[in-house]
Design a protein with these regions (language model features):
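Key DNA-contact positions within bacterial/archaeal DNA-binding proteins
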Residues: 47-48
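Residues within the DNA-recognition helix of helix-turn-helix
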Residues: 53-56
Length: 118
């Protein structure tokens, strides 16, 4: 399951780098949880053909992540925001101050997304 989640995250960031066929097969595998046999039947190719396309596409996504690191960076930023929020969750604040604090954190997350394009 972890592998499929990671593949889905990589697809969300780097999908435009794949061919249309790779996209289709990887999405069926990662998002729809289809078996190789199900994908082969849908696509009209052999199970081995699906495996080859799946492996080539996944390798390209992993190589791109190793070079660019968007998924890794986003995970670090999310962890830092979560840690910051948890550290201050028990600090007594008035409701309006708590709302402002949460708003600033959401804005910060949005800035990171805008800068990274994710």
């Amino acid at each position: 399951m972890e592998r499929l989640f990671e593949l889905g995250m990589l697809l969300d960031r780097y999908e435009p780098l794949l061919t249309e066929r790779q996209r289709s097969i990887l999405r069926q595998y990662a998002d729809e949880n289809c078996s190789l046999s199900e994908i082969a039947e849908r696509e009209g190719i052999s199970r081995q053909g699906v495996r080859d396309i799946l492996n080539r596409g996944a390798n390209l996504l992993h190589e791109t992540e190793a070079a660019v690191g968007l998924v890794r960076k986003e995970a670090r930023q999310t962890a830092k925001l979560r840690a910051f929020r948890n550290r201050f969750k028990d600090v007594p604040l008035r409701d309006e101050d708590r709302a402002a604090f949460e708003g600033y954190l959401a804005e910060l997350a949005g800035i990171w997304e805008d800068e990274d394009g994710v």
